[in-house]
Every structure is written in C-alpha cells, then in structure tokens.
C-alpha cells in the first residue's frame, strides 16, 4: 500500500493488486469524513479505464471546498480528464458534495484537465419513472422539508434546556447527511 500525504490537499491511499494479466489500482481519497474512490484498469494501447465511486466530504468539514477542488484536479490528472463510469451510491452529502463544492473548478478547468463523465450509475431510487422510486422520493423529500422546518423553528428558541439542545443537535446530525441543517449555513 502506497500512501502520499499533503498538508494542503487530500490524502491519497493507493492499493494496486495484480489481477490476471493486468494491474488494478484503487485510490481512496481521504479528505476527512467522506467518500471518493478512483479505480483504474489498464487497457491495451489506450488510457486506463477509470471508475469514480462517489465524490464528497462531510458537511461542516473545514475548507471543504478547497479540499474537493484539489481532489478534482488530482482525479483529472490521474484519469487524463475522462471518467468512464461515475457511480453515485446514494444521495448523502458526504458521497455527492464534491460536485457542489468543486462545481466552479469542474466547469472552469483548462480543456486539457477538464473532467468528462461517459456513463453514470445511480441507485434505483433515483430512476425517474420507477413507480416505487417516485413515491419514495416524494415522501422522502416531504420528510426532509418537515425536518428542516422543525430544526429551523427549534433553533430560534431561547432558553432551551440541555435535553432539548441535545435533541436539536441530533436532528442537525441527521440533516447533515443530506447537506441540510446548521452546518451548511455555518452553524454548529
């Protein structure tokens, strides 16, 4: 296992395992609590096939936008700008926030370093037109809206007891998985 670190950027753990006639490289970008894996598979006479699984960091991570922009640049360098398959495992903020946090970097990269995504896989729950997925998404979005309103309402109360504060913090933790809550707007 090779590991390279940088005080200004993400930590990258590499593990290359030999599989048959070729080597597969799996890179885990450790940018705090969050997920981002890059798998590269050599191909004869062409650039390696690249698979990116998730691209995020936990809500409230210090300098998250800088970290994710640096990670995007590193991924562009390692893939020669092409991700053959992007897999988004699920919609939690720590799995998808990089696309929001590094959006301007992804859009404004020089042509030679720009990231292109050829194919996208998402969870079945994200498929428009799937009757069950559509119902689940609708109900889930209603619940997120209700939780956000409850949090916003409770956060404005004065003289709240310790038990209520702990409950409010727990609710904020749930909201943080979806990129919502106080941590998004700079609160605790």
Q: Which residues make up each language-model segment?
A:
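Active-site metal-binding motif and surrounding structural segment of the metallo-beta-lactamase
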Residues: 48-49, 61-120
